[in-house]
Curated annotation (Swiss-Prot):
Protein name: Mediator of RNA polymerase II transcription subunit 11
Chain's gene name: MED11
GO MF, one annotated term: transcription coregulator activity
Family: Belongs to the Mediator complex subunit 11 family.
Subunit and interaction comment: Component of the Mediator complex.
Record key words, sorted: Activator, Nucleus, Transcription, Transcription regulation
Amino acid sequence: MTAIDKIQVLDSIEKELLLCLQSAGQALLELSKEKTSQKATETHTNQFLKSLNIVESKLSEQINYLTQVSTGQPHEGSGYAAAKVLQMAWHRIQHVKSRIKELEECKIKYVQATNRLQTQRTGPNPGSGGVM
């Protein structure tokens, strides 16, 4: 793998990460609207999760590649900093996943509340078993 190939791979990871952040922002924007589209929110959320998985797998590939091409000589410095960076990145990924889960729960509550309000305004549907 040439240096240009490595840079191109890292560039594609960066672009995927930007797509991931864009999707998260679009999902949040959709949830903040007064009239939320559940389909649009789910589409953006699914795109976010897909992009996040791609970024995670590509970064893992790069880490594995770097491990394989290492000289095999013991490192004179400490590996603590790299391990800490990796740990913090993993923590951030987990945090983002938990925030997405919270957003999904908020979305469900919002949709349920909206449905209740619509039912109260329009009354029960004729086929819903209401007394006539």
